[in-house]
Amino acid sequence: MSLNFLEFEKPIAELEAKIEALRDVSRHGGDSAIDLDKEIEQLEKKSLELKKKIFSDLGAWETAQLARHPLRPYTLDYVQHVFEEFDELAGDRAFADDKAIVGGIARLEGRPVMIIGHQKGRETKEKVRRNFGMPKPEGYRKALRLMEMAERFNMPIITFIDTAGAYPGVGAEERGQSEAIAKNLKVMSGLKVPVICNVVGEGGSGGALAIGVGDYVNMLQYSTYSVISPEGCASILWRDSDKAPQAAEAMGLTAPRLKELELIDEIIEEPLGGAHRDHVKMAENMKATLLRQLEDLEQLDEESLRERRYQRLMNYGYC
């Protein structure tokens, strides 16, 4: 599988191409393969050191590129690797089933939970079917329906956020995009069950926030969370989308910066090179975090849970 190396990863890509070429020779080169083992080992060490060096000092723009990586695990990947017995639930019971939002009931180590998340799609057909992970009002109303169901059956809610933003089309606006988002914010803030939100890729504006109000808000190490994309910000402030790297730095959209501002609770570590390099390892890190946080929240009664969430929301903007 091609890893789709990003621009800043070119030195790593060149090294790994050399390693793969040597492995190919080793596999088909007969007796000469013995002489290549040491060289392959040296190149692998060099590649590891280079990865550590590059990924220890990523800027906001490089992080934004990683957050959008096409091979990054999406909601259904986490469903596959973290949960058991997933049953997808569809439709908002009012207009349509928006494929940009997926949700359903599953088990986490035997514990029933409700899962809701954005789903982007990888191949062209799937991307179009999922509307590139940009939900319409019916998507957010589906999410709301599942949240209310979870509350009725006393199931914790776990959300996975990965969207460039809510879909800005005319039809979406006519069907009440802003109302759907606003209602989700209102309802989520008062739910009587634990809610854990995870930004796993792009956290784009209200489209992300509509499933992002919770008792814990986590971000993956190389995810982003912001009111607008770096390109959009650059176009507004400098009339030049090419200034996106400068905009990304100014926006403070990375997990460490948002943790510093106390807008998120925890940063979930990614495998070296990003979550796309090892879906299973990333899922293990996610699962460990969810289990620990759920255990913490399950110690609270309904009133304490809601009060804790209310205080958390009221403290936004104070550092």
Curated annotation (Swiss-Prot):
Its EC number is 2.1.3.15. PROSITE patterns: COA_CT_CTER. It catalyses: N(6)-carboxybiotinyl-L-lysyl-[protein] + acetyl-CoA = N(6)-biotinyl-L-lysyl-[protein] + malonyl-CoA. The keyword Nucleotide-binding applies. The keyword Cell inner membrane does not apply. Keywords: ATP-binding, Cytoplasm, Fatty acid biosynthesis, Fatty acid metabolism, Lipid biosynthesis, Lipid metabolism, Nucleotide-binding, Transferase. It is found in: Cytoplasm. GO terms for biological process: fatty acid biosynthetic process; malonyl-CoA biosynthetic process. Residues 35-296 form the CoA carboxyltransferase C-terminal domain. SUPFAM superfamilies: ClpP/crotonase. One of its GO terms (cellular component) is acetyl-CoA carboxylase complex. Pathway: Lipid metabolism; malonyl-CoA biosynthesis; malonyl-CoA from acetyl-CoA: step 1/1. Component of the acetyl coenzyme A carboxylase (ACC) complex. First, biotin carboxylase catalyzes the carboxylation of biotin on its carrier protein (BCCP) and then the CO(2) group is transferred by the carboxyltransferase to acetyl-CoA to form malonyl-CoA. PANTHER family: ACETYL-COENZYME A CARBOXYLASE CARBOXYL TRANSFERASE SUBUNIT ALPHA, ACETYL-COENZYME A CARBOXYLASE CARBOXYL TRANSFERASE SUBUNIT ALPHA, CHLOROPLASTIC. Acetyl-CoA carboxylase is a heterohexamer composed of biotin carboxyl carrier protein (AccB), biotin carboxylase (AccC) and two subunits each of ACCase subunit alpha (AccA) and ACCase subunit beta (AccD). Belongs to the AccA family. This is Acetyl-coenzyme A carboxylase carboxyl transferase subunit alpha. It comes from Vibrio parahaemolyticus serotype O3:K6 (strain RIMD 2210633). The lineage of its organism: Bacteria, Pseudomonadati, Pseudomonadota, Gammaproteobacteria, Vibrionales.
